[in-house]
């Protein structure tokens, strides 16, 4: 009797489990294949100016080559190639005569080498917007490059050189698009600004910040800001076979710390039990071994995966459409790669270590510099508290060299700027899915937070996996086709921005 009862209970439990499992699978599949996505149905305006003549294609390629040949390198906040920066200002005046002579455009130089343009629109009731790019580039030691990094050499359909992807492509693209539109007699309805900073790679304090101060003094407010950032990624996101456009709606914050240990000096023949180097090495080792907490789901990164859920291959599409269940698993998977780990947490990077001058002298001081890139859900103070609690050694002194909190998350639902950007991406890049993302690096746009709540970071280029490492790396390059599309993007964006409304959202469902 007892055995029979237990068998009956066991059968009931098994049946309940199987029913629950079937229900769970049904819920997962229904959400996966019917999850609605809010999209806006744009009607492409065929009357817009978009096509480029063969002569214009050659002009824009030569314009970029010439820009690359000017080595506008930012070495540090104290050292820039100011001769090259001055030369670059002269160069763009020569290459874009319509931009610098049009009665619609006001131009001024700020901070010595940065450029601010105002393009006057016909409708003063429309809030202006801002296009940003930067003139300066990071250093490019010629060793291991296939071509000299400042040659602007063309090879196999690609233009090589430092700045072809970051960010002279956008500088030339913006100015060239405006030049072509002016030649065609185009007069914008909505006013807009163009800001070209000269020190983005070293903080933007003398360039972009001066532009912001100028606009604030005039009481300017902006509908949106578009700066460099994410891109159309082709084969970069594992599990998605089609190109995907990611628009940065925020960027991580940053804290740079000096960790210092001071001890008595001595001779290596009579070493103490602990030295400044040993104490500091133990401290930075604790920081590396104890990563900052995984913050997946507390910032906009989850939004990105949900937006793209229907684009993932099976079975990843089920996981992405059901993050209410699978987010703990996904967050652990994302930790496994440095590129995706940077999305889910504040990263810790030991960048400089200084100690000692002689092999037989125990140094009194050891210093390490550590850079943290802050997840959007954390603040500078929270990170400093975690660092203190992780090191747990009063002999290690902390000093903040520079810091700023993560940028506010810009809207991607009812924002005019986001949907103009989305529309332009669809027009130019043949309709890839568009999703919000997080910029793990920093841009000049961070200085503009008091002028608008809509800041977007998107570079209008298609990047394959092998292209990503070229940015700030070896053999940076861009194809001639890509630079043509980039110019067409800005031409289209300027014209699309003349609207004063956006279409209502429609629910795009993927039915079983």
Curated annotation (Swiss-Prot):
Residues annotated as glycosylated: 45, 81, 450
Binding residue positions for Zn(2+) 1: 166, 201, 472
Domain of life: Eukaryota
EC numbers, comma separated: 3.5.1.114, 3.5.1.14
Record pathway: Amino-acid metabolism; Energy metabolism; electron transfer; Lipid metabolism; fatty acid metabolism
Keyword terms of this UniProt record: Glycoprotein, Hydrolase, Lipid metabolism, Lyase, Metal-binding, Protease, Secreted, Signal, Zinc
GO molecular function: aminoacylase activity; hydrolase activity, acting on carbon-nitrogen (but not peptide) bonds, in linear amides; lyase activity; metal ion binding; peptidase activity
Pfam families assigned: M20_dimer, Peptidase_M20
Mechanisms controlling activity: Lipoproteins are powerful coactivators of PM20D1 activity in vitro and NAA biosynthesis in vivo.
GO process terms (BP): adaptive thermogenesis; amide biosynthetic process; amide catabolic process; amino acid metabolic process; energy homeostasis; fatty acid metabolic process; lipid metabolic process; proteolysis
Any one annotated GO CC term: extracellular space
Reaction it catalyzes: an N-acyl-L-amino acid + H2O = an L-alpha-amino acid + a carboxylate; an N-acyl-aromatic L-alpha-amino acid + H2O = an aromatic L-alpha-amino acid + a carboxylate; N-(5Z,8Z,11Z,14Z)-eicosatetraenoyl-glycine + H2O = (5Z,8Z,11Z,14Z)-eicosatetraenoate + glycine; N-hexadecanoyl-L-phenylalanine + H2O = hexadecanoate + L-phenylalanine
Positions contributing to Zn(2+) 2 binding: 134, 166, 227
Chain's role: Secreted enzyme that regulates the endogenous N-fatty acyl amino acid (NAAs) tissue and circulating levels by functioning as a bidirectional NAA synthase/hydrolase. It condenses free fatty acids and free amino acids to generate NAAs and bidirectionally catalyzes the reverse hydrolysis reaction. Some of these NAAs stimulate oxidative metabolism via mitochondrial uncoupling, increasing energy expenditure in a UPC1-independent manner. Thereby, this secreted protein may indirectly regulate whole body energy expenditure.
Family from the record: Belongs to the peptidase M20A family.
Stated name of the protein: N-fatty-acyl-amino acid synthase/hydrolase PM20D1
Organism: Xenopus tropicalis (Western clawed frog)
Gene this protein is translated from: pm20d1
């Amino acid at each position: 009797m007892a055995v029979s009862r237990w068998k009956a209970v066991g059968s009931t439990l098994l049946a309940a489990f199987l029913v629950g499992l079937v229900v769970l699978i049904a819920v997962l599949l229904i959400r996966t294949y019917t999850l609605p996505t809010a999209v806006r149905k744009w009607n492409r305006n065929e009357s817009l100016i978009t096509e480029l003549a063969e002569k214009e294609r050659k002009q824009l390629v030569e314009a970029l080559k010439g820009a690359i040949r000017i080595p506008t390198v930012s070495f540090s906040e104290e050292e820039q190639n100011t001769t090259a920066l001055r030369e670059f200002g002269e160069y763009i005046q020569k290459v874009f005569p319509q931009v610098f002579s049009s009665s619609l455009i006001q131009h001024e130089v700020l901070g010595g080498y940065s450029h601010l343009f105002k393009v006057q629109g016909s409708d003063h009731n429309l809030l202006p917007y801002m296009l940003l790019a930067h003139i300066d580039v990071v250093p490019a030691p010629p060793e291991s490059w296939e071509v000299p990094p400042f040659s602007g050499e063309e090879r196999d359909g690609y233009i090589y050189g430092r700045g072809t992807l970051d960010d002279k492509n956008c500088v030339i693209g913006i100015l060239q698009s405006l030049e072509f539109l002016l030649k065609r007699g185009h007069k914008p309805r909505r006013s807009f600004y163009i800001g070209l900073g000269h020190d983005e790679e070293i903080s933007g304090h003398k360039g972009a910040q001066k532009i912001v101060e100028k606009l604030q003094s005039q009481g300017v407010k902006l509908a949106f800001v578009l700066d460099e950032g994410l891109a159309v990624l082709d084969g970069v996101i594992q599990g998605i076979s089609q190109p995907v456009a990611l628009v940065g709606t925020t960027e991580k914050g940053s804290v740079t710390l000096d960790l210092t240990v001071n001890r008595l000096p001595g001779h290596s023949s009579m070493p103490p039990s602990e030295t400044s180097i040993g104490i500091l090495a133990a401290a930075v080792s604790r920081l590396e071994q104890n990563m900052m907490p995984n913050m997946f789901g507390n910032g906009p990164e989850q939004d990105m995966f949900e937006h793209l859920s229907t684009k993932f291959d099976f079975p990843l599409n089920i996981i992405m459409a059901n993050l209410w269940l699978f987010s703990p698993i996904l967050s652990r998977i994302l930790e496994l790669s440095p590129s995706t780990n940077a999305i889910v947490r504040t990263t810790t990077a030991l960048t400089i270590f200084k100690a000692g001058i002689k092999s037989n002298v125990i140094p009194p001081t050891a210093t390490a510099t550590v850079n943290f890139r802050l997840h959007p859900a954390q603040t500078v103070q929270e990170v400093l508290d975690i660092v203190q609690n992780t090191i747990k050694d009063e002999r290690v002194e902390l000093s903040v060299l520079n810091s700023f909190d993560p940028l506010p998350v810009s809207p991607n639902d009812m924002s005019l700027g986001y949907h103009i950007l989305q529309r332009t991406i669809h027009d130019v890049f043949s309709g890839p899915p568009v999703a919000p993302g997080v910029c793990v690096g920093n841009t000049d746009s961070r200085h503009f937070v008091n002028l608008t709540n809509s800041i977007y970071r998107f570079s209008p280029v298609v990047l394959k996996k092998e292209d990503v490492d070229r940015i700030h790396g070896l053999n940076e390059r861009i194809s001639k086709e890509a630079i043509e599309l980039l110019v067409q993007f800005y031409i289209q964006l300027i014209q699309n921005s003349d609207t004063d409304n956006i279409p209502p959202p429609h629910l795009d469902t993927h039915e079983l």
